[in-house]
Amino acid sequence: YGLVGSEMCIRDRSKNLTLASLFAGLFMFMNPMGSEACTRAVYLGPDDMVVTGRTMDWKEDPQSNLYLFPRGVQRRGAISDNTIQWTSKYGSVVTAGYDIGTCDGMNEKGLVANLLFLTESSYFRPDDNRPVMGLSIWTQYVLDNFATVDEAVAELSKEVFRIDDPDLPNGAKSTLHLSISDASGNSAIFEYLNGNLVIHEGRECQVMTNSPTYDKQLTLNDYWQQIGGLVMLPGTNRASDRFVRASFYCLLYTSDAA
């Protein structure tokens, strides 16, 4: 198993980490190496424990570095004059990809954000004159400004900016989707499809992988739930199979915790 990197964010004072540790171990080793084979999952445990984990199975070293940002940092969405500006409300610790943008992080309120690859992502909308938000700082914008998933969904659903998506340093297209989770266990998935932002929100949004889009992942997962994970689970490293396995383990251990 080729695990390039992982992030585990624990937001709870509970001393009972046995189930969380078991879940994390299963999660990390169920994901064979792939070119863009990342998986994000949220464990909802006893005593309001919330654990968000993701793998970073990228085809090369993403040159990750950790940064600690305080409150009160002034930022711009892009170098363009037509951009949004803000001052960070919350401090955060983040992982940068290629040292040019925030891929993952958690702010001081327990909001976690994770960017994963999604081939179907399309940010372009014809004749779009909205202010620009660079894809490299989109995740940081969320961590800087919102304490909960509800807050983030309420603001991002207004679609007041457009996403600029330059190619990655290795020449790959920066087609990404974003997941967030908060200290209450709520989650949301954000995908830009044909220039429009599609949002899925709820505690049940515990898993995100890669292609296909989230709505199609749910349809495929429904099929496997009819079979039953204790009977058979799909075993390849395809994103849809990883989604099914992670969903099964999330449900299994969340049910045990309850």
Model features per residue range: what roles?
Residues 20-30:
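Bacterial N-terminal signal peptides
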Residues 36-130, 159, 163:
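A contiguous strand-loop segment
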Residues 149-180:
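Secretory/export targeting leaders with adjacent low-complexity proregions
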Residues 35-51, 59, 65, 75-78, ...:
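C-terminus-biased signal that marks the final domain/tail of proteins
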Residues 11-21:
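Bacterial N-terminal signal peptides that target proteins for export
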Residues 126-161:
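Compact, glycine/acidic-enriched structural inserts
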Residues 1-10, 253-258:
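Single conserved hydrophobic/aromatic residue that forms the stacking wall/gate
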Residues 44-47, 107-109, 182-185, 191-196:
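Short acidic-glycine loop/turn motifs at beta-strand connectors
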